[in-house]
Amino acid sequence: MSSDWDEIKRLAADFQKAQLTSTLQKLSERNCIEIVTLLLEKQLLDVVFTNDGKEYITPDHLEREIQDELYANGGRANLVEVSKTLNVDLSRIVTLAERIAAENPHIHLLLGQLIDEDYITHIAQEINEKLAQHGEISISDLTSQFDLPSDFLQQNVVEKHLGKIIKGRQDASNPRVFFTQAYIQRCKAKIRGALAAITKPTNVAVILQQINVQEKIFHSLLDEISPAGQVTSKQANAQYVPHIYAKTQADWVNSFYKQNSFLEYEAINKLGISDAKTYIRNQFPNEQFLFLKRVALGARLIELTVVSALNECSATKHYLDLSTILPSNLSEEDIAEAFDAVIAQKHCNPSHFVYLESIVFSQAYLTELVQPCHDMALALAKSAIDNGVYQQYIVEKTLAQKGNNLSTSHDADDDSKTDKRDERRRKAASGKAGGGAQGRETKTKSTKKHQRGRAAAHNHDSEDEEDTVQQSAGNTRKSVKALELVKSSDIINLIKITLEEEGLEHLAKPIAALYLNQLNQVALSKAQELYEATPQTNRRQTHAAIQERVNMLLVDIRLYEKGLKLFHADTQTQLVKYLLKSLGNEICNELTLYVAAECSLSVKSTNLNVDQRIKLIQELDAQYRNALLEQNKALNRSIEDFELATESVLKACSMIIKKADKKKDRALIIGHKEKLLQQLLECHEPALLLHLAALILFTTITGCILHASGKFVSAILQHIRASLNEPQNALYLVLQMLQQATPDSAESKSINEQLQSLQAEVVDLAQNYSRASVSKAD
């Protein structure tokens, strides 16, 4: 045991000797580098090299040095500056700074800077000093001063130390603003003193500029102060109006209105009130006002003065000078506006009055005034007939209409070509892009100056007679200038004598302008009546009407002929016979009756059969007899023979045969189809409904019209069957079978119900059928 202890002592002495003995050999710098490199490779040592690579340091020591730098800089250190001071790469500094901030809750890493609580406490003290000095601070000001984010300053500095280091309070309306109670009291005192000194309306902006108080604080403290006045609004142009001034204004306005029953906007504006209408409504909530452009008239003035005077004017059939009953300072424009407003509010019947230059005439007064002019208009009309002036006007008008009709025909042809081109473009566009733009027609509304009362009615009568020049598709069409039988000077000369007695001769021209068109229409109507009363005119009109009627029937026969030629020979023969029996017989009647009238023969019945016509033809002049007999015989022949015979009759009657215009055929076919559709919609009889539907489908499928009776329905359906799908054919077959069923049978009620249900489907098919629908169904 003792030997062991001795051994321990000996070893301790050797160890102490070894420690006290200096090393005889020292490692070189290269050896040290190799040793450290070896340790680093084996990951036995972790060091951080300096930027020049000559020195290295352990991360823990570097972390302590970063904290030392933070302390040396007063609690706020920029990592870039720390990197330069320690000569270490910035990324290493940032990494260690993030670790320091994560491990220590009192240190913050913010925008590349380390900030500790000591620095935050320091800037809180500075903020408190600034708040005490200025009374108010905002986060935006602090952000620019301390170069820190606004959210960090508000949450980690101001709000954290508010009430502790920072002595103040936060604005409830704006949490980014802080102020002291003393500052609020100073602002209250400034506002109270400024408002107490004001005696007239003053702009709020001027007040704020003088007392150096923010607008938000001014409006928030205004209710607490309870000033002797009110602010008009919280807008930029708001004004403060003292109660004493408002009372003075109200007293003046009340006094003026009580004396005059009206208020001028300009006078109210001079009192410092910008919106006069709103002020009047607020000042007199129980009063009714008529607000004009420059004045507001009270209801008492309107009811007791204007309305009563107008009623008296209408009752006495006289006139009224409004300038004598309205306030003298009203201009003529104000008076006109007041009259329009009274009429618009239906206090009086507008048709009873005419307003001219502040004078209101009753309609009865003007009617009596211009009564002599009616006799003059009738005399001028008779004179125009006697002199041939009106006859010349009729001839020129007829020639102009013929020229316009020819121009319209050319325009229609051009429009038809244009429509076809547009249709092709639309189809091409729809095939490529799924649709095209639809053409729109722009309508322009004329802007005419309308006169009051019934003046518009007098000027409206002859609008169609005005000079017009219309341009359409490059063609210029002119209408004959309207014949003016009555001149304005004629009316003025008649009414001026009466107006001079009343001192209203200056209104003779406006009154004449009101009635010029009406009197001219009276004269033209009388002239037309006298013109039509002559036998020569009656004969000419009858000749033109028969000529137009026969030509229309011939065009219809030609179009019907195209349709019936689509059927088999036997059916075609029957359709031709029916066509000539109906339309051909009508043409024969028209021409025979016309010739009988020309030969001064009286005919009791206008609906003649073949035998009656032949008997009547035997009594006619020889120049007509052969042609009419040949026409009646042609009714039993072909359509071509009948047309040739009819042309001979027209030639004998000196009537013009119009040439066939194939370009108008489509419009006639469409019009015929529309008439059939209208009859179909109004039809409730199954047989007639089936007949109309068959004709409509035939026109839609073939593009031709057909004149056929009900017995041809089966033939028509047989012809168009190939263009209908199976459900559509079955529908017509069932309807036809039900129609032919015995109405008195036991199943008549059931048959009627089925007919009613199928009729709607037939009407829908006839209306909406198209060739495209058949191809889709197939």
From Swiss-Prot:
Superkingdom: Eukaryota
Gene Ontology biological process terms in this record: protein K69-linked ufmylation; regulation of proteasomal ubiquitin-dependent protein catabolic process; response to endoplasmic reticulum stress
One Pfam family this sequence matches: UFL1
Cellular component GO terms, alphabetical: endoplasmic reticulum membrane
Molecular function terms, GO-annotated: UFM1 ligase activity
This protein's UniProt keywords: Transferase, Ubl conjugation pathway
Keyword Transferase carried by entry: yes
EC code: 2.3.2.-
Sequence segments annotated as region (Disordered): 404-477
InterPro entries, sorted: Ufl1 (IPR018611), Ufl1-like_C (IPR056761), Ufl1_dom (IPR056580), Ufl1_N (IPR056579)
Signal peptide, first to last residue: none
Residue spans of biased composition, Basic residues class: 445-457
Enzyme superclass (EC): transferase
Job of this protein: E3 UFM1-protein ligase that mediates ufmylation of target proteins.
Family: Belongs to the UFL1 family.
Protein name, entry field: E3 UFM1-protein ligase 1 homolog
Organism of provenance: Drosophila virilis
